[in-house]
Curated annotation (Swiss-Prot):
Protein's gene: MCP
Compartments, as annotated in UniProt: Virion; Host nucleus
One Gene Ontology molecular-function label: structural molecule activity
Keywords, sorted A to Z: Capsid protein, Host nucleus, T=16 icosahedral capsid protein, Virion
Family: Belongs to the herpesviridae major capsid protein family.
InterPro entries reported in the protein's UniProt record: Herpes_MCP (IPR000912), Herpes_MCP_upper_sf (IPR023233)
Protein name: Major capsid protein
Endpoints of the signal sequence: none
Subunit structure as annotated in this protein's UniProt entry: Homomultimer. Makes the hexons and eleven out of twelve pentons. Interacts with triplex proteins 1/TRX1 and 2/TRX2; adjacent capsomers are linked together in groups of three by triplexes, heterotrimeric complexes composed of one molecule of TRX1 and two molecules of TRX2. Interacts with scaffold protein; this interaction allows efficient MCP transport to the host nucleus. Interacts with capsid vertex component 2/CVC2. Interacts with the small capsomere-interacting protein/SCP.
Source organism: Saimiriine herpesvirus 2 (strain 11)
Biological role stated in the UniProt entry: Self-assembles to form an icosahedral capsid with a T=16 symmetry, about 200 nm in diameter, and consisting of 150 hexons and 12 pentons (total of 162 capsomers). Hexons form the edges and faces of the capsid and are each composed of six MCP molecules. In contrast, one penton is found at each of the 12 vertices. Eleven of the pentons are MCP pentamers, while the last vertex is occupied by the portal complex.
Coiled-coil residues: none
Length: 1371
């Protein structure tokens, strides 16, 4: 049949199937070409455009009526829509009341006046028709070939027309869907705000707080419900429950009442429509079943096609309306009228409009029939994103290296083999998106924690100065040492403690004496204020006439971390790790260490031992001379008490082991000395094994790893010229301050150092020595008297291990520096008749010949009976003894990894070396009178300043600690500033605090060695390689992206769509074609009395990031920043894998731009790398904090309960640590290094410091630290909650009320980036030990969140993953 013989569309009287409209309209259009235009289509373009407009009117909304989306819409013709600029419709709603019979006053009638605003939309399409094809339509068809060409032209033009018309049809659907989404808040918002428990209480602070809590709960519980249902025993009931909540959360009241547009075949109304994706639709049908496969929709559209001029159909509750005026008269002015009775007026003598079946899925939810539809295919065909597919961003966090406090316990009955309480975790096991177990450890984080910016206090100090310019009660004690104008140590000590009635306790000591709970309590916020950086001690000072300035000095050693943030049990775990990593096998045992402790606390320790030690003063020749006396002292004391004499001196220990192994003393005693010395050697070898053999920056790498191996740290006691040796070998510009003189050049040795040679070489110089001893003012003689250093046998490492590790640990710090009055000692020994009386036999017991005096009292108290010859030889040793005990103040540059400072003095580290002094134990009461004449206390080092020992050496110290009893603790004991200033020292209060409480076990020695590991990048590299904890934990933060498939519910007839007249005009006329633009004006009006739609994530289609362990490379982000030593900088970058790109010039501009200089990986295995950033965190951070959603800052950031426009109040909420954390009222924070103003985390991620420290690349942490963004989000959140509550609480409205039930600004961010909005990250599945994760993956009903010192954190997030390892799955 020829095409022209088909019936014309405008002669058709009726059509029941919607699809027939397109076919009939298209066929009739071609006949109209010849009737109206003739052969040349370009001659009558206006008529053709009008005809094309008629065609588009006739076919535009057919496909829309076939969709289930139309269930929720009402369509109305509005020819003058293009003239409308601001369309509004006002509705009056009467509020019903309840009449009470208890005498209450009747309520007045209330009326809501709701103003509904329309929103205009524009859709357009382009149609291109070939001129040649149009001309073929009018050629005579004389041959079969002509007919074939004619049919081909018809098909071509039909295809072009179909393309344009389909675009308009899809445009309408897309517009309506977009309008619906604009009126569809997330379910977790509507569900919360619809709860009368909250809405009836008013919008107070406590109510807002409750609302936020419920937002969080519903967000986690309701999101991705289809995924969660797959692993629930009653999945169908769970899914139906969520769908029921969606239906119940929306408003079912509209301005139209009573009649349903769409229904089932048996007449049951369709209550609404669920729009979703193909996959979600299939899953829903599979889970809850399908109640029907079609619905009955209006078919009246065809009737209007044949009526000529009225080509736009307005469908409202199954009826067609002529125009907008008719809409106003019937639905607005008289909305309760029965439209069925008005059918004659409406349709001009036409009865009820006909309906046609439309194929769609219908599900039964409760007692309601809901249409279920997916429009995804339409978007897939057009290669456009589907609005119900959204990208969600969730930020996860997990801890690395936390230490669980005692008592240890376990919640597992199956995990075995990890019961060792000393096993400290240095890693976190996580599961990535492909269920691959991955280990995040400190080696992953080296690219961040080794960067210069992480090791800099400059920004912290600057931010503190800006935030706290006024500081009351400034502390000056311990900040800076004073120059000693005298070499007389006795005078220095006496002047300091004489008439001293006030004790100062700086924050270092205060923190060392506090518990973890105390230091984080809001009442201690002033102490906590300066705890802003794990590597630095910060203090405030004010110079005369200047403002307050904040300074920072490096903590040097991991043992100097405050005990509340790095407790002793944790340090012992590090000691155990050191043993394992270095292969240390202790030679010493607990019994020997207890003997040393008993010796230190022995009130009967022989005073004669100190006299002998002072006469020998570290000189081997004098030791050899006096071996018989020394052996007598050792053996007598061992026999009397079972304790060890001379154990307070390294040189005495060394000489005893060297020269007294041939029977001078008992085998048992000698064995103890050998064990002690053997322990020193074992520790030394373990240190070298740990450090390795590399050289960095012209230094052995061990110097940058452990302070014991650092040649710039000298032993605390010196008897030989170790100072010149330091000047010759150190590259850190050491300066030896000798009183008022500075010795910084080894060429000045003769002016600053007096080398006392061996006695046999000084026979001819004895007179000069005697004259110098008696005629010189030694208080003003700035020269050190020391022996010659034997460099080939000198081993400072063994000496430092003894003085800084073994002796403090074994004595519990019950030891103090002691000065000697050599003149009085000599008088005590020599001014006795038997000593040099030739009549007395040298083998005679001297006590048999001594008269009453100091020496007799000393010998009697010591219970030692030397011979006359022994005392004579001891007196001979005095001939070349030093004149006085002296002190030298050593200043050196810090190592190149620790020299980023806030002020010039901070570049230096200081220590005091006691020259020809000794370490003393407490003096017994019976010996004190004699001791006070011979010795005096010199508290010069935090490990050698026990006030109880010092009090036994001089009554002035005893008076001081008696008057101020708190000063009896070595941690807080005030020390002379001419000898020590704690902020400048190598050893600080935390190490003193540890030794005072540690047990006498070999582990304590390992712990003290581990505490000497440096807080420096090279040390971190070494420790991470050997799995030794660096002293601080990490909070790893990662943002992952999820493609989520949503489901939207919309109630019936909740949106009115106004359709204007289409406009067709020629866009372009060419010789080969004519291009037409078809534009259509649309407007939408929400007709519901509340929110009629809601949306919820139903299924996670894909996780686009790997959820892995890739850590941020700060060397790539800030390539221009480097350590001052270039060799060190290159070494660090090479070791951590952040080298410069090969072949790129050092000064290439790309080096300073950050983003383009890195070489990307050749390929990816698990998808886009999700970058982890690390926040330094105290190891004592509460593990329960990480088991729920919280701010990675360590303190709550969401301040929506505050006044939205009171920034001061909001900032106090964020940063004022005198206020408790609103989420955890018993503390201010869990991480002072990140939550406080000026803390490392704050200055690093806060955009306020962007010009100096804000990462220029992607930073998942920035959203939690950027103050401006936080306050902005909080205001937005406040507004969001307020706006939603105003719309849903039913507050009376006025004629000025213009509440539009639309999605409030920020809702999309809330839904898609909830972590940014709520300022919280979600915990991801992680475990400190793989065993706990393996148990968790065993899919048992119980698992072990805590096991001794190990922990597991479960994943609590909106998206719940199915985890699978091997054949084991757990959800």
């Amino acid at each position: 049949m020829e095409v022209e013989n088909r019936p014309y569309p405008y002669m058709v009287s009726d059509a029941n199937l919607l699809q027939q409209i397109k076919e009939s309209s298209a066929e009739g259009l071609f006949k109209s070409f010849s009737l109206l235009l003739g052969k040349d289509v370009r001659e009558s373009g206006v008529k053709f455009e009008a005809l094309l407009g008629v065609y588009t009117n006739a076919t535009q909304f057919v496909k829309f009526l076939e969709t289930s989306l139309a269930v929720s819409c009402v369509n109305t013709e509005f020819k003058d829509l293009k003239r409308m600029t601001d369309g509004k419709i006002q509705f009056k709603i009467n509020v019903p009341t309840i009449a009470h019979g208890d005498g209450r006053r009747p309520q007045k009638q209330k009326q809501f006046i709701i103003m509904k605003a329309t929103n205009k939309h524009h859709i357009g399409a382009e149609i291109e028709l070939s001129t040649q094809d149009l001309e073929l339509l009018f050629l005579s068809k004389e041959t079969p070939l002509d007919v074939t060409e004619y049919v081909g032209a018809v098909k071509t033009i039909t295809s072009a027309l179909q393309f344009g018309i389909d675009a308009l049809e899809r445009g309408l659907i897309d517009t309506v869907l977009t309008v619906k989404l604009r009126h569809a808040p997330p379910l977790f918002i509507l569900k919360t705000l619809a709860d009368p428990t909250y809405t009836e209480r008013g919008l107070k602070k406590n109510v807002k707080s409750d609302l936020i809590s419920m937002f969080k709960t519903h967000l986690v519980n309701n999101s991705f419900f289809l995924d969660k249902s797959e692993h629930l025993p009653h999945s169908r009931q769970y899914v139906l429950g969520i769908l029921t909540e969606m239906i119940g959360a929306v408003c079912k009241e509209t301005v139209f009442k009573g009649i349903s547009t769409y229904s089932t075949a048996n007449g049951q109304p369709i209550s609404g429509v669920l729009e979703t994706t193909d996959k979600v639709m299939r899953k829903l049908v599979n889970v809850i079943g399908q109640a029907d496969n079609s619905i009955m929709g209006p078919a009246a559209y065809a009737n209007y096609v044949v009526r000529g001029e009225n080509l736009v159909t307005a469908i409202s509750y199954g009826k067609a309306m002529r125009n907008f005026d008719h809409f106003m008269s019937k639905l607005v002015d008289n909305p309760t009228s029965n439209l069925d009775n008005d059918a004659v007026d409406t349709f001009e003598s036409t009865g009820s409009i006909q309906k046609t079946p439309i194929s769609t899925s219908v599900v039964m939810v409760g007692n309601k029939l809901i249409a279920l539809e997916s429009l995804q295919r339409m978007y897939n065909e057009t290669q456009l994103p589907y609005p119900l597919n959204r990208r969600m961003h969730y930020t996860y966090y997990f801890p690395v290296g936390l230490h669980l406090p005692s008592p240890k316990y376990s919640t597992s009955m199956s995990v075995k083999g990890t019961e060792n309480v000393l096993h400290q975790s240095v890693e976190a096991w996580i599961v990535n998106k492909n269920n691959t177990l991955q280990c995040f450890n400190y080696q992953n984080a080296l690219k961040s924690i080794c960067h210069p910016r992480m090791n800099s206090p400059i920004l912290c100090a600057r931010a503190l100065g800006e935030a706290f310019p006024d500081v009351h009660n400034l502390n000056i004690y311990g900040i800076r040492s004073e120059d000693a104008h005298t070499m007389n140590l006795y005078q220095i000590v006496y002047d300091y403690y004489d008439n001293k009635h006030v004790a100062h306790v700086h924050s270092l000591a205060q923190k060392s004496m506090m518990t973890h709970e105390e230091v984080l309590h809001p009442t201690n916020h002033e102490i906590l204020r300066t705890e802003v950086h794990p590597f630095f001690d910060v203090y405030a000072e004010r110079h005369q006439g200047a403002a307050v300035q904040y300074r920072a000095t490096h903590r040097n050693l991991s043992g100097n971390l405050p005990p509340p943030l790095a407790p002793y049990s944790f340090q012992e775990c590090r000691g155990y790790q050191f043993e394992v990593a270095s292969g240390l096998n202790h030679v010493i045992d607990s019994t020997t260490m207890e003997i040393i402790q008993e010796t230190a606390f022995d009130p009967a320790y022989p005073l004669l031992c100190y006299i002998v030690e002072s006469m020998i003063h570290g000189q081997e020749e004098k030791f050899v001379m006096n071996i018989p006396l020394i052996a007598l002292c050792i053996q007598t004391y061992w026999n009397n008490s079972g304790r060890l004499a001379f154990i307070n001196s390294f040189y005495m220990l060394k000489f005893i082991c060297t020269h007294m192994g041939n029977g001078h003393i008992s085998k048992d005693a000698y064995s103890c000395y050998r064990k002690i010395y053997g322990e020193l050697i074992a520790i030394e070898q373990s240190l070298y094994r740990l450090a390795g053999h590399e050289n960095v920056a012209n230094e052995n790498i061990g110097q940058l790893i452990n302070a014991i191996l650092d040649k710039d740290l000298l032993p605390p006691f010196a008897y030989n010229d170790i100072f010149t040796n330091l000047l010759r070998k150190s590259s850190r510009h050491p300066v030896v301050k000798i009183g008022m003189e500075e010795y910084d050049d080894d060429n000045d040795q003769q002016n600053c150092i007096n080398i006392r040679e061996k006695m046999e070489d000084l026979v001819g110089n004895m007179v000069n020595i005697y004259q110098q001893r008696n005629n010189t003012d030694h208080s003003r003689r700035y020269v050190l008297d020391v022996g010659e250093l034997q460099e080939n046998t000198y081993n400072s490492v063994l000496e430092k291990i003894f003085y800084y590790v073994l002796l403090p640990v074994c004595t519990n710090g019950h030891v103090c520096g002691m000065g000697v009055d050599f003149e009085n000692v000599a008088l005590t020994l020599t001014y006795n008749g038997p000593v040099f009386a030739s009549a007395v036999n040298q083998d005679a017991d001297i006590l048999d010949h001594l008269e009453n005096g100091t020496l007799r009292d000393v010998l009697v108290a010591s219970e030692i009976r030397p011979t006359v010859g022994m005392i004579r030889r001891l007196c001979t040793s005095f001939l070349t003894c030093p004149f006085i005990t002296q002190a030298a103040r050593i200043k050196t540059d810090r190592d190149p990894g620790q020299n980023i400072v806030t002020h010039t003095d901070g570049k230096y580290v200081h220590q005091t070396v006691l020259v020809n002094g000794f370490a003393a134990f407490a003096i017994a009461d019976k010996s004190r009178d004699a001791a006070h004449c011979l010795f005096y206390p010199v508290p010069f080092n935090k490990l050698y300043c026990d006030p109880m020992v010092a009090a036994t050496l001089h009554p002035i110290v005893a008076e001081f600690i008696t008057e101020i009893p708190s000063q009896r603790n070595a941690v807080v004991f005030n020390l002379p500033p001419r000898l020590i200033a704690e902020y400048e020292e190598w050893h600080k209060s935390p190490m003193s605090s540890y030794v005072s409480t540690c047990s006498q076990t070999p582990l304590s020695l390992s712990t003290m060695i581990a505490m000497h590991l440096k807080l420096s990048p090279v040390s971190f590299i070494c420790q991470s390689r050997h799995k030794i904890h660096p002293g601080f934990a990490l909070t790893a933060v990662r943002t992952d992206e999820v493609v989520a498939e949503h489901i939207m519910y919309s109630s019936k007839a909740s949106t009115s769509v106004f359709i204007g007249q289409p406009t067709v005009h020629r866009k372009e006329v060419r010789s080969d074609a004519v291009v037409f633009d078809i534009n259509h004006e649309l407007a939408s009006l929400d007709t519901a009395l509340g929110y009629s739609s809601t949306i919820v994530p139903a299924h996670a289609a894909a996780i686009t990031t790997d959820m892995g362990i890739h850590c941020q490379d700060l060397f790539a982000m800030f390539p221009s920043e480097a350590y001052s030593n270039q060799q060190l900088n290159e070494y660090i970058k090479q070791k951590i894998g952040s080298d410069r790109v090969y072949g790129m010039p050092l000064r290439d501009p790309r080096e300073y731009m950050g983003g383009n200089r890195r070489v990307t990986l050749p390929g990816l295995s698990h998808g886009q790398l999700a970058t982890c950033e690390v926040i330094m965190t105290p190891v004592t951070a509460d593990i329960t904090y990480f088991q729920s959603s919280n701010s990675p800052r360590g303190r709550a950031s969401c301040v929506v309960s505050c006044d939205a426009y009171n920034n001061e109040s909001a900032e106090k909420f964020l940063y004022d640590h005198s206020l408790p954390d609103p989420c955890y009222e018993f503390r201010s924070t869990i991480n002072p290094w990140a939550s406080q103003i000026g803390s490392l985390g704050d200055v690093f991620f806060n955009s306020q410091h962007r010009q100096m420290a804000g990462p220029t690349l992607y930073s998942p942490c920035k959203q939690f630290f950027n103050k401006e963004a936080i306050l902005k989000n909080n205001k937005l959140f406040y507004t969001l909650v307020t706006e939603y509550v105003n719309r849903l609480t039913g507050a009376p409205a006025t004629s000025n009320t213009d509440f539009q039930y639309v999605v409030i600004n920020g809702t999309d961010v809330f839904l898609e980036q909830p972590c940014q909005f709520l300022q919280e990250a979600y915990p991801t599945l992680s475990a400190s030990h793989r065993a706990l994760l393996d148990e968790y993956m065993s899919h048992k009903t119980t698992h072990a969140p805590v096991h001794v010192n190990q922990y597991l954190v479960e994943e609590v997030a909106p998206m719940k993953r199915l985890l699978k390892v091997g054949n084991k799955t757990v959800y």
